C-alpha cells in the first residue's frame, strides 16, 4: 500500500540559545542549523524511513530552499513527482530553542 501525504513543507531555521533575549538584546552564543520542516514533509520522510512507499503532494518555491527540500525528501525515499514548483518563496520557519523548549 502506498502512503500519500498532502501537506506543507518548509525549511526550519533553528537557533539554539542559552537564554531568550530581552527586548533590544542580541544573544551571541546561538548555535544555528537548518532542517526539513512542515507537517506534511516530516510525515512523508518518517513514513519513508520506516519503509513505506510514499508520495508527497504539495508545493515548494522555485528557489534554493525548494531544491533543498526536494533533495532531502528524495534522499529519504519520498516520491516528489507530485510536488509543484510555484512562483512564491519556499516557506521558512524561524525557531528559537532555549533549554530544550521552542
Q: Where are each of the predicted segments found?
A:
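Residues that form or immediately flank small-molecule/cofactor binding pockets and catalytic motifs
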Residues: 61, 88, 99
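Conserved phosphate-binding/catalytic loop of the ribokinase/pfkB sugar-kinase fold
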Residues: 85, 95-102
Amino acid at each position: 500500500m502506498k502512503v500519500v501525504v498532502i501537506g506543507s513543507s518548509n525549511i526550519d531555521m533553528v537557533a539554539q540559545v542559552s537564554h531568550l533575549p530581552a527586548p533590544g538584546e542580541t544573544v551571541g552564543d546561538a548555535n544555528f542549523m537548518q532542517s526539513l520542516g512542515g507537517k506534511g514533509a516530516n510525515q512523508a520522510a518518517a513514513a519513508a524511513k520506516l519503509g513505506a512507499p510514499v508520495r508527497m503532494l504539495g508545493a515548494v518555491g522555485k528557489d534554493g530552499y525548494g531544491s533543498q527540500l526536494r533533495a532531502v525528501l528524495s534522499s529519504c525515499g519520498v516520491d516528489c513527482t507530485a510536488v509543484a514548483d510555484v512562483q512564491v518563496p519556499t516557506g521558512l520557519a524561524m525557531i528559537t530553542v532555549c533549554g530544550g523548549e521552542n
